[in-house]
């Protein structure tokens, strides 16, 4: 297959090295590869016959008309020339996209394939039992249970529950503190009665447990003090239970639950936080004759570290321990996003089932770090100057000063009582420039920096402080 690789002078050597072993012509069409025009490509295709063209993934032009005229398919290559070596071996084995850069396209294809494998494995899995249609145990994927603490105090419980399910929770657990009443429990579950998704109640109070049995699918925290009181009621309701150890052992409490007639039992050996017996508590996660519950959320909430790595590692430990349900929460600001992170982590563990390590799976939990850094070609220049320090004196823009902030998922820039809002920093800056609100170049540079900081704060769920460090 003969390939045409139009490129720029800045990346020519890199592309030539990558294409050396292929039947490919590397042609420089200008200084920058992404500036290739349909006319320039049309002229190249008139000179020689090719089976396909791979243009820079950064090209913004449409080559649809050129393809119609010449019959030669024009595909998007990677956005970065350094990645062309990863794409060329695939030519002829699969069709690249005409509109999406090859690196994005291939990553999406791998992710789609990975998610299909997860879906197929879940479809074929034979569970220990079902909870409102959700498979628990057996060979099914480890299910994510997300907690809402003090559910009776939640302002919009329905939206919160729906949001948790949308984020990836298989089960939403409604916790009720010591100040909750049976009426509180009844009210909360009545607001969710028509939701066709698994809900759990988390309380040790027998009266609160009874109040939840009309809708709850799982009861958490049964042990020797409440099983004698509500065990038969729970059994009659046909709901599943999570049994924990108390003053007696977990094994004895499971036996108590069985004696009461409960059939769907999940064992929770109680995972302890780091520093309070975490390693020792892992020894309790032995093989049980029933599904096992892994309380990862308690560990993450009590660890001042980014949640994404902690959730990934705990999901791996839970998978090795044979857990069927993994608990997570978003109670604190630092754990926001844990539901989505934990769902992805459980999917990674499914894909890692037949591998020695959970890597190169098609999906990952890399957020800030890269799996592999690109080795870009060095910049070419003939002269350089050392940057001078920015002067301490500030020249105020005569048009006025801005206050930058964030509201939900939007960036807000305010001047003279008028706000411009947007989701992308460049859109906000462009609007401010178009309105004539900025007259000094250094003010524009400053605003670009602050607006981008605001966008990053939204993306990563962080606080934003104008003029502060990110």
Residue ranges and their predicted role:
Residues 140-159, 220-223, 246-248, 299-307:
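Active-site mouth loops of central-metabolism enzymes
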Residues 102-107, 118-120, 125-129, 135-137, ...:
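Conserved anion-binding
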Residues 169-197:
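Glycine-rich, proline-tolerant flexible connector loops at the mouths of alpha/beta enzymes
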Residues 4, 11-22, 76, 237-369:
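Catalytic alpha/beta core domains of metabolic enzymes, predominantly
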Residues 396-470:
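Extended hydrophobic packing segments that form well-structured cores
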Residues 152-164, 209, 227, 250, ...:
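Short, acidic/polar
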Residues 55, 74-76, 142-148, 170-174, ...:
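Hydrophobic faces of well-ordered beta-strands that scaffold small-molecule active sites
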Residues 1, 86-159, 403-406, 464-470:
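N-terminal amphipathic alpha-helix/helix-capping segment at the start of soluble metabolic enzymes
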């Amino acid at each position: 297959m003969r390939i045409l690789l139009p490129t720029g002078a800045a990346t020519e050597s890199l592309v030539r090295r990558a294409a050396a072993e292929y039947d490919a012509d590397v042609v420089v069409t200008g200084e920058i590869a992404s500036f290739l025009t349909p006319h320039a490509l049309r002229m190249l295709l008139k000179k020689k016959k090719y089976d396909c063209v791979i243009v820079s993934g950064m090209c913004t032009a449409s080559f649809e008309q050129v393809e119609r005229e010449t019959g030669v398919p024009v595909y998007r290559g990677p956005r970065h020339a350094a990645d062309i070596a990863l794409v060329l071996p695939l030519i002829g084995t699969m069709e690249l996209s005409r509109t999406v850069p090859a690196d994005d396209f291939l990553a999406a294809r791998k992710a789609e394939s990975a998610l299909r494998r997860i879906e197929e494995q879940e479809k074929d899995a034979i569970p220990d039992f079902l909870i409102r249609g959700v498979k628990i145990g057996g060979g099914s994927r480890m299910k994510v249970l997300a907690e809402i603490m003090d559910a009776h105090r939640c302002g919009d419980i329905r939206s919160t529950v729906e949001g948790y399910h949308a984020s990836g929770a298989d089960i939403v657990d409604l916790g009720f503190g010591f100040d909750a009443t049976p009426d509180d429990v009844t009210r909360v579950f009545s607001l969710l009665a028509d939701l066709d998704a698994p809900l759990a109640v988390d309380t040790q109070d027998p009266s609160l447990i009874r109040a939840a049995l009309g809708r709850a699918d799982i009861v958490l925290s049964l042990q020797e003090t409440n099983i004698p009181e509500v065990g038969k009621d729970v059994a009659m309701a046909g709901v599943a239970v999570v049994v924990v150890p108390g003053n007696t052992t977990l094994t004895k409490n499971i036996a108590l639950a069985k004696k009461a007639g409960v059939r769907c039992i999940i064992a929770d050996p109680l995972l302890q936080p780091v520093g309070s017996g975490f390693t020792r508590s892992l020894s309790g996660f032995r093989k049980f004759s029933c599904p096992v519950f892994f309380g990862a959320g308690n560990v993450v909430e009590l660890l001042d570290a980014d949640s994404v790595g902690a959730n990934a590692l705990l999901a791996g430990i839970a998978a090795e321990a044979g857990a069927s349900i993994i608990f997570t929460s978003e109670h604190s600001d630092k754990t926001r996003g844990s539901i989505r992170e934990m769902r992805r982590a459980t999917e990674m563990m499914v894909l890692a089932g037949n591998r020695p390590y959970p890597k190169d799976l098609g999906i990952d939990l890399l957020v800030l770090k890269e799996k592999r850094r690109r080795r870009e070609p060095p910049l070419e220049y003939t002269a350089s100057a050392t940057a001078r320090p920015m002067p301490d004196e500030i020249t105020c823009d005569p048009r006025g000063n801005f206050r930058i902030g964030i509201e939900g998922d939007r960036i807000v820039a305010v001047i003279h009582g008028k706000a411009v809002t947007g989701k992308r920093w460049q859109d906000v800056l462009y609007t401010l420039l178009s309105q004539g609100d900025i007259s000094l170049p250094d003010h524009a540079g400053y605003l670009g920096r602050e607006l981008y900081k605001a966008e990053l704060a939204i993306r990563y769920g962080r606080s934003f402080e104008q003029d502060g460090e990110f």
